[in-house]
Amino acid sequence: MMKNSCRLLLILIGLWMANVSLAQKTFRNPIITGMNPDPSICRVGDDFYLVTSTFEYFPGLPVYHSKDLVHWKLIGHALSRPENNPLMGCNASTGGQYAPTLRYHDGTFYVIGTNYGGKGSQGVFYVTAKNPAGPWSDPVWVGNWYVDPSIEFIDGKMYFLSPDNQGSFLLGVMDPETGTFVEALRKVASGLGGSSPEGPHFYKIGDYYYIMSAEGGTGYEHREVIQRSKSPWGPYEPSPVNPVLSNMNCPDHPFQAIGHADLVQLKDGSWWAVCLGIRPVNGKYQHLGRETFLAPVTWDADGWPKVGKDGVVQETYLFPNLPSHVWMEQPVRDDFDQETLGLDWTFIRNPAHSFWSLTEKPGSLRLKGTAINFTTNDSPSFIGRRQAAFNLTASAKVNFIPKVENEEAGLVVRADDKNHYDLLITERNGQRVAMIRKTLKDKVVDTTCKELPATGEVILSITATETTYTFEIKAAHVSAILGTASTRDVSNEVVGGFTGVFIGMYASGNGQANTNPADFDWFDFRCLD
C-alpha cells in the first residue's frame, strides 16, 4: 500500500512538473517594450541580433542580443559617435534615424539606414562591425534615396532594395566596400494597393526571391504584404493571402498598427517574424511608442508565408524551439558611480559633452543648464530613458540652487519638443520653488508651484499609470503631490510623430547658461507592469 502511494505521489509530481514546464514554454508580447519600432533581425549561429529605429534620439540604432528570440539585452548602438550620426536640426519625432536593416555576411555585420533631416546628413548610409556590440565603422554614404533601405547577401552579391517615394521598389547590386552600385538601381516591383509602401526586405527562399513590405501608413491600417519572383529583377506576383500580417480588422485587439516585419529562420528550420506594433490605452491612444513583437511564421504548400494566426499577432505564443536564456536584470537605481553612462541612457540629438559630467562631482550626474530648452530642434541638457511600461515610477534626488528665475532643473515626461510635462526646481520672486509645468502644442497650459527650503536636496518623483502621470516632491519639511497629467495628451494620436514618451533629467537656462549645475545623486526607474 505504501509503495503504491509513493508511486502515485511520484506520478502526480511528474505530471505537475510537466504542466509547469509546459506553462513556462510560452512568451508574451511585446518582446522589447518602449519605443523600438522597425525591428530588423539576423541570426549568427546560436545568437540573434536585432536593431530598431531611434529618430532624433542619440545614440542611434540600438543593437540587441538574444539567445532565444524572446529575452533581449541591449549591447550597443550602431551609431554611437556624434560625427557619424548628425542629428542637429532634425525635426522632433519625424526626423533622424529611420528604419534600419541588420544583416551578417562573411564575418561582418552591416546596418543600413537613412538619416533624415539632420545637418550634415547625406541620406542613406551603412555601417559595419566585426562585433555587433561595436565599435562600428564610420558611415559609408550611399545617396539621397528614400527612407527604409534594405540589403541582403545572396549568391555572393549585396542586393540593395529601397522604396522610391512613388509607390515602387528599386533594386540594385552594391559593392560592399565602397557603397557604389555595380548593377544600377531599377524598378522591379510596386506596392500592392495600400498607401505608403515602405520598409521592404529582400529574401531568397528556395527557388523564389521575395519582397516583403509594409503598407497603409504607420497608423491603425498598417499591414505587411509579400510578393515573389523567380528572378530578382521580376516580374513579381503578389501572395494570394495578402496581407500576411495585420491586426487592422481586429479593432478590439490590444495590439494595433502591426507591420514593418523582418523574417528569421531557426536552426530547426522554423521561421519567425519580428514586427512593430502599438498598445493603445482603452483602444484609442498610445504613448509608449511603437514596440517590437514576435510571432511564428507558417508556409503553405505553395510557398507563401503567413505570420501569427491568420496574420494576426497575439499576446501569447508557444516558446520557440530554443533553450530559454534570461539575461540578468538591470539595476533599478543608477547611482552614477561608474565612469560612463549605461547603454540605456539617451540624449536628444547630438549632445555637447560640456553639459554633463560623471567626474566633476563623483557619485553624481552633473547637468549644466545651457541656453537651450525643449522648444527648439537643438540638443538641450537632457538625459533620459524610454518609457518601457505603462505603470512605472521614475524618481531622482537632485541638488540644485537656482540663482535667477530663468534657471531650472528637474524631470521631464517628453513626447517631443512641443509636448512635455516638466517637474522642476526654479526660482520665483527670490524663493526656491518646485513646479509642475505642462506644455502642450507648444503652449504652457498649466503650472503649479510649491515653496522649497532655500538649500538642500529634493526628491522628484513621477508615477505613471495607463492614463495618468502623478508628480510628487519631497524635501526637508516638505512633501507634496503637485498635480497630475494625462497620458492621452502626449499620445501619438494627439501629438503626431513616430516616437514615444521618454522620461529623464534635464537642466536649462532658458536663453542663457545656468549659474549653478544640477547634481543628480541617483535616478530610480521601476517598471511595474
Swiss-Prot record:
GO CC, any one term: periplasmic space
Cystine pairs: none
Keyword Metal-binding applies: no
Pathway listed: Glucan metabolism; xyloglucan degradation
Top-level EC class: hydrolase
Keyword Hydrolase attributed: yes
An example molecular function term from Gene Ontology annotations: alpha-L-arabinofuranosidase activity
CDD domains: GH43_XynB-like (cd18617)
One Pfam family cited in the UniProt record for this chain: GH43_C2
Positions annotated as active site in the UniProt record: 38, 198
Keywords assigned by UniProt, alphabetized: Carbohydrate metabolism, Glycosidase, Hydrolase, Periplasm, Polysaccharide degradation, Signal
Marked site: Important for catalytic activity, responsible for pKa modulation of the active site Glu and correct orientation of both the proton donor and substrate: 148
Domain of life, per lineage: Bacteria
Record field: transmembrane: none
Catalytic activity line of the entry: Hydrolysis of terminal non-reducing alpha-L-arabinofuranoside residues in alpha-L-arabinosides
UniProt GO BP: symbiotic process benefiting host; xyloglucan catabolic process
Alphabetical list of SUPFAM superfamilies matching this protein: Arabinanase/levansucrase/invertase, Concanavalin A-like lectins/glucanases
Record note on pH: Optimum pH is 6.0-7.0.
Signal peptide range in chain numbering: 1-23
The EC number(s) this enzyme carries: 3.2.1.55
Subcellular location: Periplasm
Physiological role: Alpha-L-arabinofuranosidase involved in xyloglucan degradation by mediating the cleavage of terminal non-reducing alpha-L-arabinofuranoside residues in xyloglucan branches, converting the 'S' units to 'X' units.
Family classification: Belongs to the glycosyl hydrolase 43 family.
Name this protein carries in UniProt: Non-reducing end alpha-L-arabinofuranosidase BoGH43B
